[in-house]
């Protein structure tokens, strides 16, 4: 069955901002200052997705660290193209077992293309029970809602359904310092090369709409 490309509505994105506000209010009520560690593996697309995750977290009241031991939330933003990157992710998940024991309230998240693989999500579900949240690239725009579910229910959340391809514009980003900014203008691929798994995870090609604020990234480099 052919899967359709779906443009995420403004109302749906506004709902995610409501979940960001809920998370921020929760930590404010606890007089806590949440810290997140976002560890990105793989290509420039993953770097761009990592900056979106950080943008949504910043709007939820988080600051950032590179040390998972200091973090209340650890995100492994994964790549499924190279086996070496996959092995590193599982190695890091093993290490995070110890940080979770030291800080039982820490939330650990696995996302990206690797998380979309059924064998990986099943392995995590069975063997890495300290991982709280797993979601694929199509659910990235719903990250605030998924994270809120974890905080509210204290149960593990898996969002790796083989959904239609989504196009979500206007997601906040936190960019690293410097003169480079990754702006995704298209997703997916229509060429099913025998050696590549990208079309199976990111689905068919879909592009940003013309003349939107998303393109402003090309004109806003600051020196």
Labelled PLM ranges:
Residues 1-223:
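Proteins enriched for Cys/Gly/acidic motifs involved in redox and nucleic-acid/cofactor modification
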């Amino acid at each position: 069955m052919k899967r359709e490309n779906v443009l995420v509505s403004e109302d749906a994105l506004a709902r995610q901002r409501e979940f960001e506000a809920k998370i921020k209010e929760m930590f404010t009520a606890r007089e806590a200052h949440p810290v997140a560690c976002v560890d990105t593996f793989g290509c420039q697309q993953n770097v761009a997705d990592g900056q979106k995750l950080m943008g949504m977290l910043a709007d939820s009241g988080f600051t950032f660290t590179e040390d998972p031991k200091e973090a209340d939330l650890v995100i492994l933003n994964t790549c499924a193209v190279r086996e070496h990157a996959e092995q590193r992710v599982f190695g890091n998940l093993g290490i995070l077992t110890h940080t979770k024991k030291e800080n039982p309230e820490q939330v650990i998240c696995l996302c990206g293309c690797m998380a979309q693989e059924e064998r990986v999500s099943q392995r995590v579900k069975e063997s890495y029970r300290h991982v709280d949240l797993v979601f694929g690239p199509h659910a990235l725009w719903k990250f605030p809602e998924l994270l809120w579910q974890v905080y509210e229910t204290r149960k593990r959340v898996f969002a790796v359904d083989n959904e239609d391809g989504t196009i979500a514009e206007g997601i906040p980003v936190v960019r690293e310092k410097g003169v480079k900014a990754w702006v995704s203008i298209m997703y997916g691929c229509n060429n099913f090369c025998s050696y590549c798994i990208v079309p199976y995870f990111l689905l068919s090609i879909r592009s940003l709409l013309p003349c939107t604020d998303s393109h402003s990234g090309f004109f806003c480099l600051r020196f």
